């Protein structure tokens, strides 16, 4: 070992100790998660829930838009119909082991039945436990939109006006006129 190698090795050791000394009293980056709550941004997308309307009925009308827009295909449902003609999902299933929490299902839902919550603690030991059924997804309240009721807003006639005559409403399209 030459004198030059000895000096370089010693300088390297001194520099390492100096760097440790500089960083020893800085604020730690590690979060003590279970003891301290984690800061989540206001628009954080976490666990998906199904909500109810203000009347207590489930909002989902089984339109299948959420399953169609899901890029990984983790949502599956089957439509059924009540005696009064209202649609509802006979089963609604989300496989959270495949879900990427993109939020497209929430945007596609016309009834605001699907909502993403800031809940992120979904760790399980078995993958089968990450498949949530309708009973596990449905919450008792309306979620982010407490006053919205799909069946009170859609399909309600406006007194004195026929279809296409209301403000900000387009004229109905005659689909048969578009055919070749």
Swiss-Prot record:
Classification via InterPro entries: 4Fe4S_Fe-S-bd, 4Fe4S_Fe_S_CS, NADH_quinone_OxRdtase_chainI
Q: What is its EC number?
A: 7.1.1.-
Query: Which UniProt keywords are present, listed alphabetically?
Result: 4Fe-4S, Cell inner membrane, Cell membrane, Iron, Iron-sulfur, Membrane, Metal-binding, NAD, Quinone, Repeat, Translocase, Ubiquinone
Region: Disordered; residue ranges are: 160-180
Residues recorded as binding [4Fe-4S] cluster 2, renumbered to this chain, are 70, 99, 102, 105
| Cofactors | [4Fe-4S] cluster
Name of the top EC class for this enzyme: translocase
List the Gene Ontology MF annotations in alphabetical order: 4 iron, 4 sulfur cluster binding; iron ion binding; NADH:ubiquinone reductase (non-electrogenic) activity; quinone binding
Cofactor remark: Binds 2 [4Fe-4S] clusters per subunit.
Give the superkingdom in one word: Bacteria
The UniProt function text for this chain reads: NDH-1 shuttles electrons from NADH, via FMN and iron-sulfur (Fe-S) centers, to quinones in the respiratory chain. The immediate electron acceptor for the enzyme in this species is believed to be ubiquinone. Couples the redox reaction to proton translocation (for every two electrons transferred, four hydrogen ions are translocated across the cytoplasmic membrane), and thus conserves the redox energy in a proton gradient.
Assigned protein family: Belongs to the complex I 23 kDa subunit family.
Indicate what this protein is called per its UniProt record: NADH-quinone oxidoreductase subunit I
Source species: Photorhabdus laumondii subsp. laumondii (strain DSM 15139 / CIP 105565 / TT01)
Higher taxonomy:
Bacteria, Pseudomonadati, Pseudomonadota, Gammaproteobacteria, Enterobacterales
Q: Which gene encodes it?
A: nuoI
